[in-house]
Every structure is written in structure tokens, then in C-alpha cells.
């Protein structure tokens, strides 16, 4: 494949022919007594199945509870998913069960599900589902998806992302306190370049830091800049940070500033995603003041983050806005 081809992947946004009713409800309450249920949103019907199945048996959290959570946070979540291809990670037997990745939207499927058809290598076209509204969100979660993994670029130009980001992941021997220290170092580095940046817990072991950028540079160009920043951080903080991607060569007791997640076609768990962890933790936006004071991954769980969202709103709202995005073009070589 030539470099030019790598930087251009044809995509086609197939919007559903069936029009949605603008007045469709944006909230839903699922009865705890129901095991199977069909919800109607205007002219969209969503079938929910196996609602009583325990997805976290130790916590007594059911599939119904998971779907209800996503319904409750949909107003802050949906702007971050809209118009983006979704990679499905399905857990049919709950958080501790086996899972599998699924890119192709299953068929048959509701006629109102939008599709992002992306050409990969050798002309292979993958028809990804797109979560545009509450019904499509509930449909995807009902398939057994616990967390959500959307593309960094919107479907109308899948080669040009809206973000530059870093995945901070502790190498064995490093602590979460080391991750928080690394997050502050990343913040200092990107803010020295006048880049705005926002943090969230991964809900697993680390922290994600995102920089909203003006769409224009290709995914490869964004990856290159992220790599340069990560390498500088590692050289300036050798006892704390590593940017070595190969596991066998990676020094222990460091925090990996993973720039490689900026590669084309990669995804990270979205903001507000529940993670398949023993405590049903959530990838939640956090303030820099909270990072400075100290937080724990387990502070943010399916059972308690709704109160936080109600109080603080969407701390990541700027990531979904067209305003105050960083112009990366001057940094391209």
C-alpha cells in the first residue's frame, strides 16, 4: 500500500431511510420485573432481551441495570458518539465472561440504524453501526456491549480525527499515583504548546488525556505529533515515563504514554463507558484539580456516577464542540 493510500480510506455514510420523529422521548425507565421488553420511540422500536441476566453476579447488577445506566446518561454521552463508526465489544455472558469484537453491523438489524461503510485494505468494506440517538444506543447495548468504542474521526472523513490523545497505562511495578503524576506531566507539556487538554479515567487502570483539534491533519500526522510529544516526555522523565511500545523492551515501574492509540482504526473506551471490571467502574471525566488532589479508579462506578453527572454536567462538553479547538497544522512537518 502506498503512503497516499494509507492516508485516504473511502467511507460512505448511509443514513437510515426511515426518518426519526424529533419528538421521540429522550428518557426511558425499564421495569425491574421485565425480562424481555419492546420500547417505542416514535417510529423506532427497540427490543430488549434477557434483562434479568446477571452481568456482575457479585454486585447483583443485571443487563437491565446496564441498559438503564446508558439510558440515564444518554444526554451527555450521545454528542461524543454521533456520526462515528462504532466497534462493538460484546459480552454475551456478562463482565467476567468471554467477549468478542464485532465491526460489521449485525444483520438483520432495525432499518433506522445508520451505517458507516469504511474501506479497509484490499478493498474490504466494513459496515460499522453508528449510534445517533437513544434508540440506537439501547440497541447496541442490548447486543451485550458493556463499553463503547467509537472512532476518533467522523464518518464523513475517517482519515481526519477530531482529537489527539494519550493513553496513560501503568507498566507492572507502577502505581495509579504514578499515573496521576504522569497525567500532570502530560498536561504541562501540551499546555506549554498552548493545547487545551481534558482528562478522564479509563475505568480500568489508567487515564486518558484528549486534545480537541481542528479537523484537517490526517490520522498518521496526528499520530506522529503524539509520538514526538511522548518521546520528549519520556526523555525528560526517565524514572517515571516510558514511550517504548514493545512490551518486551518496556522498562518496569514506569507509566506508558501510549501514543500508538492514535493510529488509524484504533479505538479507546468512550467517555461514560462502563468497563467490564469487578466493580463496574466507569470511564469518567475528571478535573485537573481532582487529579492533583488524588483520585481512585474505583471512585467512579455504575452505581454512583449518575449523581456526579447530574451535579457537574458534561465536563467533556468542549470535546464535542466546534469552538476552541487547537490548530495542529503549524506543527506538521
Located regions from the model:
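Short N-terminal amphipathic alpha-helices
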Residues: 77-92, 98-100
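C-terminal accessory nucleic-acid interaction domains of nucleic acid-metabolism proteins
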Residues: 1-61, 65-67, 78, 82-83, ...
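Signature for HUH/AEP ssDNA processing cores
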Residues: 129-202, 213-221
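A contiguous, low-structure linker/loop signature
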Residues: 97-151
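A short beta-strand motif that forms the metal-chelation/ATP-contact edge
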Residues: 208-214, 255-259
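Short beta-strand
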Residues: 88-91, 197-203, 244-248
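Beta-sheet entry/capping signal
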Residues: 45, 85-87, 98, 196, ...
Amino acid at each position: 500500500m502506498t503512503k497516499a493510500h494509507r492516508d485516504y480510506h473511502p467511507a460512505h455514510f448511509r443514513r437510515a431511510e426511515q426518518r426519526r420523529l424529533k419528538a421521540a422521548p429522550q428518557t426511558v425507565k425499564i421495569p425491574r420485573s421485565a425480562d424481555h421488553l419492546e420500547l417505542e420511540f416514535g417510529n423506532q422500536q427497540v427490543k430488549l432481551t434477557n434483562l434479568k441476566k446477571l452481568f456482575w453476579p457479585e454486585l447483583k447488577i443485571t443487563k437491565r441495570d446496564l441498559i438503564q445506566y446508558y439510558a440515564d446518561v444518554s444526554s451527555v454521552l450521545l454528542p461524543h458518539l454521533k456520526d462515528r463508526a462504532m466497534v462493538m465489544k460484546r459480552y454475551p455472558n456478562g463482565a467476567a465472561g468471554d467477549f468478542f469484537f464485532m465491526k460489521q453491523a449485525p444483520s438483520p438489524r432495525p432499518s433506522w440504524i445508520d451505517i458507516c461503510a469504511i474501506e479497509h485494505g484490499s478493498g474490504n468494506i466494513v459496515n460499522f453501526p453508528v449510534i445517533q440517538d437513544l434508540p440506537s444506543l439501547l440497541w447496541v447495548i442490548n447486543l451485550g456491549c458493556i463499553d463503547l468504542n467509537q472512532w476518533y474521526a467522523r464518518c464523513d472523513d475517517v482519515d481526519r480525527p477530531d482529537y489527539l490523545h494519550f493513553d496513560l497505562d501503568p507498566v507492572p511495578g507502577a502505581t495509579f499515583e504514578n499515573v496521576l503524576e504522569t497525567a500532570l506531566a502530560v498536561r504541562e507539556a501540551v499546555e506549554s504548546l498552548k493545547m487545551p487538554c481534558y482528562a478522564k479515567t479509563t475505568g480500568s487502570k489508567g487515564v486518558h488525556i484528549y486534545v480537541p483539534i481542528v479537523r484537517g491533519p490526517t490520522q498518521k500526522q496526528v499520530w506522529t505529533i503524539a509520538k514526538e510529544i511522548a518521546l520528549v516526555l519520556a526523555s525528560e522523565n526517565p524514572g517515571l515515563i516510558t514511550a517504548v511500545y514493545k512490551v518486551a523492551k518496556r522498562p518496569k515501574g514506569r507509566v506508558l504514554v501510549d501514543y500508538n492509540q492514535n493510529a488509524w482504526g484504533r479505538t479507546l473506551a468512550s467517555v461514560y463507558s462502563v468497563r467490564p471490571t469487578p466493580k463496574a467502574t466507569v470511564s469518567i471525566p475528571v478535573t485537573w484539580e481532582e487529579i492533583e488532589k488524588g483520585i481512585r479508579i474505583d471512585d467512579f462506578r455504575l452505581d454512583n456516577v449518575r449523581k456526579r453527572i447530574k451535579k457537574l454536567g458534561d465536563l467533556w462538553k468542549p470535546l464535542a464542540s466546534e469552538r476552541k479547538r487547537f490548530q495542529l497544522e503549524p506543527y506538521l512537518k
